[in-house]
């Protein structure tokens, strides 16, 4: 995403860097909760109580998202103050305000995905957690950024013309938010399938008990 931002302005690059630093607070919170969630899921699957494992994930996700929505509300209400903590350049603050107003409300969805990823890891289904990260960046964020931010036109064989929207740097911010929301929807749907419930239990059941 940094390479895309660099095609606009120095102020946009600086604002993006500051915005990511502010976002790192949400990642820290979500990462810690995700680790705790992984432990809870592993323990409950190990004791053959998958429903309680699911409850751990949903409650942890809801609590994390509530905290991050509250934090985002403060940042959206006072975006200039949040950016001003790091820099006093008017152009950067202006770009940063745009970034925060668009991206900050999606912090909760980033956090929700990280907690659900913790649930998958606790169940021993680590590949799903990796796939969710891939989806967020390469399936949702980057393609949406190419369509929203840039002004290209492409004509397909047969005469069908495709055109990007050309929203500029704001298109990148919307793509960032879209990646969070899209990956969260997929994460929730995948987790609700329940295919993870046999992860730890099956692996333990297949291991022969030691004999004396």
What are these regions (language model features)?
Residues 2, 28, 75, 144-145, ...:
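Structural signal for membrane-spanning alpha-helices in multi-pass inner-membrane proteins
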Residues 4-24, 91-97, 125:
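Interfacial/gating helices of multi-pass transporter permease domains
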